[in-house]
Amino acid sequence: MSQDFSREKRLLTPRHFKAVFDSPTGKVPGKNLLILARENGLDHPRLGLVIGKKSVKLAVQRNRLKRLMRDSFRLNQQLLAGLDIVIVARKGLGEIENPELHQHFGKLWKRLARSRPTPAVTANSAGVDSQDA
């Protein structure tokens, strides 16, 4: 998997965001943020960012946070294949320094990857014919 952040790896429409908000399969709370995730059925992850003016006042800080989040996602996307991910910023996130944020995101991605539900074994995947069962 390449480490790019192309258009196909972004949540672009309100419908995509709504799907993650309405039924997340994984939640990882962090320091001043929340990560929501949902299986997307694709072979690559997609990222959406929600950083409101109420949470982070200055545009410079919002843009810095978005840049750091995208970069961290890009470097860790092999852990996150098949997920739609939304990061919701909360108050105080803009005051955290860059190295601390990078370290924090590294831990959060690993926690999210560990919290993924393991695929359930179905009758068909176990080699049992459903008509005989």
From Swiss-Prot:
InterPro entries: Ribosomal_Su5_D2-typ_SF, Ribsml_uS5_D2-typ_fold_subgr, RNase_P, RNase_P_CS
Lineage: Bacteria, Pseudomonadati, Pseudomonadota, Gammaproteobacteria, Pseudomonadales
Native source species: Pseudomonas putida (strain ATCC 47054 / DSM 6125 / CFBP 8728 / NCIMB 11950 / KT2440)
Matches recorded under SUPFAM superfamilies: Ribosomal protein S5 domain 2-like
Family the UniProt entry places it in: Belongs to the RnpA family.
GO CC annotations, alphabetized: ribonuclease P complex
NCBIfam families per record: rnpA
Catalytic activity, EC: 3.1.26.5
Coiled-coil ranges per UniProt: none
Subunit structure of this chain's protein: Consists of a catalytic RNA component (M1 or rnpB) and a protein subunit.
Catalysed conversion reaction: Endonucleolytic cleavage of RNA, removing 5'-extranucleotides from tRNA precursor
Gene label: rnpA
Its biological purpose: RNaseP catalyzes the removal of the 5'-leader sequence from pre-tRNA to produce the mature 5'-terminus. It can also cleave other RNA substrates such as 4.5S RNA. The protein component plays an auxiliary but essential role in vivo by binding to the 5'-leader sequence and broadening the substrate specificity of the ribozyme.
Annotated protein name in UniProt: Ribonuclease P protein component
One of the Pfam families matching this protein, by short name: Ribonuclease_P
